[in-house]
Design a protein with these regions (language model features):
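Short, flexible loop/turn elements at secondary-structure junctions
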Residues: 34, 46-50, 76-78, 97-100, ...
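Non-catalytic C-terminal accessory region of glycerolipid acyltransferases
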Residues: 105-275
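Conserved nucleotide-cofactor-binding alpha/beta core module
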Residues: 71-102, 106-107
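Short helix/loop capping segments that flank catalytic or ligand/cofactor-binding pockets
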Residues: 52-55, 82-83, 138-139, 179
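A short alpha->loop->secondary-structure connector
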Residues: 62-72
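Glycine-rich, often proline-containing surface loops adjacent to acidic residues and nearby aromatics
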Residues: 37-41, 89-96, 125-132, 221
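Membrane-anchoring hydrophobic helices of lipid-metabolizing enzymes
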Residues: 1-42, 48-59, 63, 85, ...
Length: 275
């Protein structure tokens, strides 16, 4: 019998992820977890390429390295199918609301910020969140400054101190072949001419495609936490400027840690034939 989310993760999802790796990858490597302390909670901020696997495969790596699994943010737009909702709730996922008017948006951001801080600081539970709203479709991984500002919303006193309390850890994920590349390219091509309207069932199709299709080599690299020492030089800046600098620090960490694949080299050669 399974009675807790942790048991579900260890007895079901861990083996499910192993089977996904066996069937659809040629290699999975996660580096950097040795720099983290198993007893310390972290806020993992990751570039986002796959709806489910970016966070789910990290869970396996955490277990293998002797860490506790983390809670996972999941967009409300994905919590529409009953099966997805059930699996999400059983897998330490929590719903992130998007949209609404300015007041509703602010209240949602404040609620999310408070929950993340409560999870990390008060309960000692690590959390995973993507660096931006939605997956990267053009290969340009950029952290939204608004995300960092959201982290700081729930802090009291010095905002940089409140950010340091979250133990932000940038994570770089890299797939040799992105399972949803054709779907992403089609969406980008259509969006170039008119606003893209997502069709019913499209997110579920992307989840299934991402899990089932070949990925080749998969590489994750966990980087050093952004602690008080790293954030201290920003103390003299206004909040908005400090937030932008923190977002850039996350970007630089992810880009430096990103494992380039032959597909990246081929794409660059096509874009820059003169070099």
């Amino acid at each position: 019998d399974i009675s807790t989310a942790r048991e579900f993760q260890l007895r079901v999802m861990y083996h499910f992820n192993r089977e996904v790796m066996r069937r659809s990858t040629t290699q999975f490597v996660c580096e950097g977890l040795e720099m983290l302390q198993p007893a310390v909670p972290y806020l993992f901020v990751s570039n986002h390429r796959d709806i489910v696997l970016d966070a789910s495969l990290l869970q396996n790596a955490l277990v293998d390295a002797g860490h506790e699994t983390c809670e996972i943010t999941f967009g409300a737009n994905l919590m529409t199918h009953p099966t997805v909702v059930d699996i999400g709730k059983s897998n330490k996922m929590f719903r992130v609301e998007r949209g609404g008017n300015k007041r509703q948006f602010y209240e949602s951001e404040l609620h999310l910020s408070r929950y993340i801080r409560h999870a990390v600081v008060d309960r000692g539970s690590s959390v995973w969140i993507a660096q931006r709203n939605g997956r990267t479709k053009d290969g340009l991984d950029r952290t939204e400054p608004a995300l960092v500002k959201m982290f700081a919303l729930s802090g009291t006193g010095n905002k940089l101190t409140s950010l340091a309390q979250l133990n932000i850890v940038p994570v770089a994920v890299s797939y040799e072949y992105e399972s949803c590349d054709l779907l992403k390219a089609r969406e980008m091509a259509q969006a170039a001419h008119k606003p893209y309207v997502k069709q019913p069932g499209e997110d579920i199709n992307s989840i299934i495609t991402g899990i089932s299709q070949p990925k080749g080599r998969v590489h994750f690299r966990v980087t050093k936490p952004l602690g008080a020492a790293q954030l201290a030089p920003l103390a003299h800046l206004p909040l908005n400027d400090a937030v932008r600098h923190v977002a850039l620090m996350i970007d630089h960490a992810i880009i430096d840690a990103y494992q380039l694949m032959p597909t990246n080299m081929a794409a660059y050669a096509l874009l820059h034939p003169e070099e």
